Regions:
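Hydrophobic ligand-binding cavity/cleft-lining segments
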Residues: 2-61
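A conserved amphipathic terminal alpha-helix motif
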Residues: 1-13, 141-175
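Short beta-edge strand/loop motif at the mouth of beta-sheet-based domains
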Residues: 29-30, 49-86
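A short, structured loop/turn motif at beta-sheet edges
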Residues: 38-40, 68-70, 94-101, 125-134
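Short Pro/Gly-enriched beta-strand edge/turn motifs at strand-loop
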Residues: 14, 47-48, 72-76, 104-109
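Hydrophobic pocket/interface hotspot
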Residues: 41-42, 51, 75, 93, ...
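Beta-strand/loop substructures that line and gate deep hydrophobic ligand-binding cavities in soluble
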Residues: 3, 25-27, 105, 109-156
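Hydrophobic/aromatic beta-strand elements that line small-molecule binding cavities or substrate pockets
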Residues: 32, 64-67, 89-95, 120-127
Length: 175
């Protein structure tokens, strides 16, 4: 497919990790398997106290100012670099089907919650088979220019974040 970047990494534990970029459609597709129960993976994606433990790529940290996980609710958070620079964002939840799917609109913002002009729509799907939970994430970017601007850092950062999540889930699962 033209304008597509694809990365597949099975790692040492043979869990699927697929990251595909389709610039023509302004889409990013991520499929990642975790050796953890679906309810735990769901919690890791939907509870601020868990999200903040894995979402920021090292050495950054994440700090949620507030979260209201319901349709129409928001999470307002920052990624903080080692020099203290904060990059704020808003996630507005647009659809929630407990334990299996949630959708949100994500947009960068300033510290006062004033959003930038363009954001992205995220669709998270969760399923479990034989103790392995698969998370499928589809991300539609409103602006190709925005997508291309953040893509390199996003790709590296998301891979690091999902690796952090794998480690957190292993600790929480005691596997």
């Amino acid at each position: 497919m033209l304008n597509e970047e694809k990365s597949r990494n099975s790692g040492t534990n043979d869990l699927l990790f697929d990251f595909t970029v389709d610039k023509a459609k302004k889409m990013v597709y991520i499929t990642r398997e975790f050796d953890a129960e679906q309810s735990l993976v769901w919690d890791a994606f939907t509870k601020a106290e868990l999200i903040d433990q894995w979402i920021a790529p090292h050495p950054m940290i994440a700090k949620t100012k507030y979260q209201d996980f319901k349709v129409g609710g928001k999470r307002f958070y920052a990624m903080i670099s080692t020099d203290g620079m904060e990059r704020w964002a808003i996630q507005e939840y647009t659809s929630i089907t407990p334990k299996t799917n949630f959708k949100m609109f994500n947009v960068f913002a300033d510290k006062d919650e004033n959003p930038e002009p363009h954001g992205s729509d995220w669709d998270h799907n969760f399923s479990e088979q034989n103790g392995i939970t698969t998370v499928n994430i589809s991300i539609y970017n409103e602006s190709l220019e925005r997508m291309e601007k953040i893509l390199e850092g996003f790709t590296i950062g998301m891979k690091m974040s999902l690796s952090n999540l794998e480690n957190l889930l292993a600790t929480l699962s005691k596997k």
